[in-house]
Amino acid sequence: MASNKIIGIDLGTTNSAVAVLEGNEPKIITTPEGGRTVPSVVAFKDGETQVGEVAKRQAITNPNTVASIKRHMGEAGYKVSIEGKDYTPQQISAMILQYIKGFAEDYLGDTVEKAVVTVPAYFNDAQRQATKDAGKIAGLNIERIINEPTAAALAYGLDKTDKDEKILVYDLGGGTFDVSILELGDGVFEVLSTNGDTHLGGDDFDQKIIDWLVDGFKADNGVDLSKDKMALQRLKDAAEKAKKDLSGVSEAQISLPFISAGASGPLHLETTLTRAKFNELTADLVEKTRIPVENALKDADLSASDLDVVILNGGSTRIPAVQEAVEKWTGKESNHSINPDEAVALGAAVQGGVITGDVKDVVLLDVTPLSLGIETMGGVFTKLIDRNTTIPTSKSQVFSTAADNQPAVDIHVLQGERPMAADNKTLGRFQLTDIPAAPRGVPQIEVKFDIDKNGIVNVSAKDMGTNKEQKITIKSSSGLSDDEIDQMVKEAKENEEADKKRKEEVDLKNEVDQLIFTTDKTLKDLEGKVSEDEVKKAKDARDALKKAQDDNNIDEMKAKKDDLNKIVQDLSVKLYQQAQEAQGAQGGADSNAAGNANSAKGSDDNTVDGDFEDLDKDKDKK
């Protein structure tokens, strides 16, 4: 039976998390390993797919490992080629979502079909559509896509809905950066503005350390580690660890023995990275986040002094230099009351509760991050919906023809902020045809934009004279067709079945190993205690099972395992009965001996009393 719960998923660049509403509180669902976040890593090995911690652990030795795929969501034509097969970012993301769905179902004890998934506030339409496609491939109905900073504010504001506050959410994750300004009052979360950079995050901070290590090693040893894939993965792991360590200590030791080899033998990397040096290396990245903060405040028509609360979200906000910079820019001490790795998933779970009706009196009013419009005469970008407009929203405008007797108009839909169409991102094109012949400027063409609650765009063009209408739901240029999505859903399900089958086979082989071991032990214990025929029967069954195991014949293993199991159980019962009989015989002999001893004392009924008397005497002696 499917659960009516809607899980909240933070599909992150480096780590993901999932939460569910229990009672009135959102709760993180832990991974099978007990972790509270899932590394957004997928590995392929011999046709098997691994996701999460296990995939991340073997990344050094397995080149078929994919990480930070979120950076490529919505990217036209981008694919990763693994073991002779191409995968889109949607498919890789779907594998992560499928894994999350699986352990969430184990926790809830029900099938999970619905989810709220978060995206960076500055994700464009193509990236949002790709996220929805990934959910569909994973077998999840994405009930709502919400912006990550908005989700963080939901987690923060759940128990503070009686306050009127202006909140700045500074969200620096593994691969993306967002800043949003929200107003919270009477249970309404209204997003006033949003800004950011979808290609800036903790990965870039790691890269600065990696570059520093590579340059230093090259200067000392004349070896370029950036050309060595395995060394590079070790450097990445060491850089990430050093970055995390420097959030708590002033210097971090980096020790990588046998990182390479030179003419005189193995080479080792041993160095110390101080927090001061780290701050120097990454100062430009921290500074890069300042402009979006200023722009978001400007778009919300606020100054830093108008802010009541500053929330830091995303694991990279643990970096002390980031915290200091945000506090300096805003003049406010940042709020650390929420775990920055978990807030987004918790907020998504709250939104799930809003949708199911479990959370009352909370309304989320999100915004579109970029302006939307069409190309008009002269290649001009004419905006119909300005950025930071609250969604869902609808806007229409009447246009006309540019030439006499023009039979059709091309509707070129764009997203962006530049005045010329060529400088903005194309979302789609369609044509309205069969316009009756008329002088230029006479036909009335109504163009209407609709943005739904997920930020997905629908555009229509209607000839007011004939009522002829043409519509388009914007799919990104990298979006997948329904057929492609259906095929990927099918493949994902097939892989799920294959993975399940593979696990069952491994479990069966383990059971067979254990049974053969138990049989050998039982036969040894039964030596000389059962007939030769029974021993032969057991040995034959054991050998038949061993042969099936050696042949890797799954069906035979199942059948022979059941046969041997029955024989071993029967023998074990016999062994137990023999032990009981032997114990009974021994017990009888002991009773007779005790009875004879008592008779010699001339007592008729003193066996028990005799025992007690002896104990009492012992007590008296003490």
From Swiss-Prot:
CDD domains recorded: ASKHA_NBD_HSP70_DnaK-like
Coiled-coil region list: none
Annotated Acidic residues bias: 606-615
Keyword vocabulary terms for this entry: ATP-binding, Chaperone, Nucleotide-binding, Phosphoprotein, Stress response
Top-rank taxon: Bacteria
Keyword Chaperone part of the UniProt annotation: yes
Modified residues (Phosphothreonine): 176
HAMAP family the UniProt entry points to: DnaK
PANTHER family given in the database record: HEAT SHOCK PROTEIN 70KDA
NCBIfam families with a match to the protein in the record: PRK00290.1 (NF001413), prok_dnaK (TIGR02350)
Its job: Acts as a chaperone.
Name of this chain's protein: Chaperone protein DnaK
Species of origin: Lactiplantibacillus plantarum (strain ATCC BAA-793 / NCIMB 8826 / WCFS1) (Lactobacillus plantarum)
Name of the coding gene: dnaK
